[in-house]
A protein has these predicted regions:
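N-terminal beta1-alpha1-beta2 module of alpha/beta enzyme domains
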Residues: 1-68, 150, 358-360
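An alpha-helical appendage that flanks or caps ligand/catalytic pockets
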Residues: 2, 111-143, 183, 188, ...
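Active-site mouth loops of central-metabolism enzymes
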Residues: 6-19, 69-76, 146-157, 212-215, ...
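Hydrophobic faces of well-ordered beta-strands that scaffold small-molecule active sites
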Residues: 6-12, 36-38, 63-67, 94-98, ...
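Short, acidic/polar
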Residues: 16-28, 82, 156-164, 297-308
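Acidic (Asp/Glu)-rich catalytic clusters
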Residues: 26-30, 52-61, 83-94, 166-167, ...
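Glycine-rich, proline-tolerant flexible connector loops at the mouths of alpha/beta enzymes
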Residues: 35-58, 70, 102-105, 177-180, ...
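Alpha-helix-loop-beta-strand connector modules within alpha/beta enzyme cores
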Residues: 49-69, 73, 128, 339-355
Length: 360
């Protein structure tokens, strides 16, 4: 059986300085990471495109880009200009991933983009990045004179957003956890959106963001995984319903208020603490929404997910292994997540997939 080997990306690097970020992405490239993604969150990190430009200059092969930006805090024309400038120094290895807005929006007191707004901004971005004249109310058509060919991806989890993304994006990053049933449903929604728009679903690439609790102590890892499951329920409760899993505790908003969880169950400063708040969830909840455990355990989970998806005709272009909890900044040395994961997990996963392809 032929199984596509995905590119593995990391979305947490040293953002304590521009120089530090460039060096950290170069370090990731040298250690075998295929992609380096950067959340666009202006109250948490330095300017996204300044950091990406520095990384572009410092590297040669690694794929770079924001994951994710949004049409609320930046107008699409500003984003198109910025990502094209980055791509001048990272041609054929820059991508742009957008979403409704996460911490960038919520921590600024703004509202996430609506689905129609995200769709319209995606169409505008694609037009600007392909050099097409666009009407944006300036009196005459606008053109980006230094545009670069940068693919526009969307990040999504809900069925309506996934369907919309399949109809207009070059690729879709799904954030639906690690259970193959939710992955199957997400791919189905993307394909449906592509078909409704007259597109061939095969041309819409797929990526996945997996929260990765790379923690040796199983009980501790499960507790953090429960916080991840709660975070998914907080924003996309249908993901539990799809798996016939139940939420037996108070509403997440009530728990956040009473227990001081901020800003949500995915981003709380102490994920063991937030995980204990939802201890009514079962270990299976945690395992359905995060990769959990030591290197061997996570490697097995990844190979199973990729193989099961391939049987269903689902191939991943990218898999982003988002570290849980966030690593320290900076995170130097051989014990760091950035150095351990390629050596202890990614290399073995790629070898296993290669062996499967060769029938070994």
């Amino acid at each position: 059986m032929k199984i596509n080997t995905p590119k593995f990306g990391l979305n947490r690097h040293d953002t304590s300085s521009v120089k530090g970020y460039a060096a950290d992405v170069a370090r990731a490239e040298s250690l075998g990471w295929d992609a380096a993604f950067l959340p666009d969150s202006q109250l948490r990190r330095r300017d996204t495109y300044v950091l990406l430009y520095a990384a572009a200059i410092a590297t040669q092969q690694i794929v770079i880009g924001p994951l994710l930006t949004n049409p609320v805090t930046r107008h699409p024309s500003v984003t198109a200009s910025s990502i094209s400038t980055v791509a001048e120094h990272a041609q054929a290895r820059t991508i742009l991933a957008c979403g409704v807005g996460d911490t960038a929006v919520r921590l600024s007191g703004l509202k996430p983009a609506k689905i129609n707004e995200l769709r319209d901004s995606t169409i505008l971005l694609k037009s600007l990045l392909t050099g097409d004249p666009v009407e944006i109310g300036s009196g005459r058509p606008s053109v980006l004179p230094f545009r670069q060919d940068v693919p526009v991806w969307l990040a999504a989890g809900g069925p309506r957003t996934l369907e919309m993304a399949g109809g207009c994006a070059d690729g879709v990053f799904i954030r639906v956890g690690t259970n193959i049933e939710n992955i199957r449903i997400a791919a189905l929604n993307i394909n449906r959106g592509a078909q409704k728009s007259g597109r061939d679903p095969a041309f819409v690439k797929l990526g996945a963001v997996f929260h990765t609790v790379f923690v040796e102590e199983e009980d501790k890892a499960i507790t953090m995984g429960k916080s991840m499951a709660a975070g998914y329920y907080e924003y996309s409760p249908m993901l539990l319903k799809n798996l016939n899993m139940h939420w037996t505790g108070p509403h997440p908003d009530l728990l956040k208020e009473s227990e001081g969880i901020w800003p949500d169950f995915h981003h709380h400063a102490n994920l063991e603490e937030s995980g204990r708040v939802v201890d009514f969830l079962a270990p299976e909840h945690a395992r359905s929404f995060a990769l959990i455990g030591n290197a061997k355990s996570i490697s097995i989970q990844l190979v199973e997910i990729i193989s099961e998806a391939s049987v269903l005709g689902i191939e991943f272009e990218y898999i982003v292994l988002q570290p849980i909890p966030n690593p320290p900044t900076p995170d130097p040395g051989p014990d760091s997540y950035l150095e351990r994961v390629p050596k202890e997990i990614i290399s073995g996963v790629k070898e296993s997939l290669k062996s499967t392809h060769l029938g070994i």
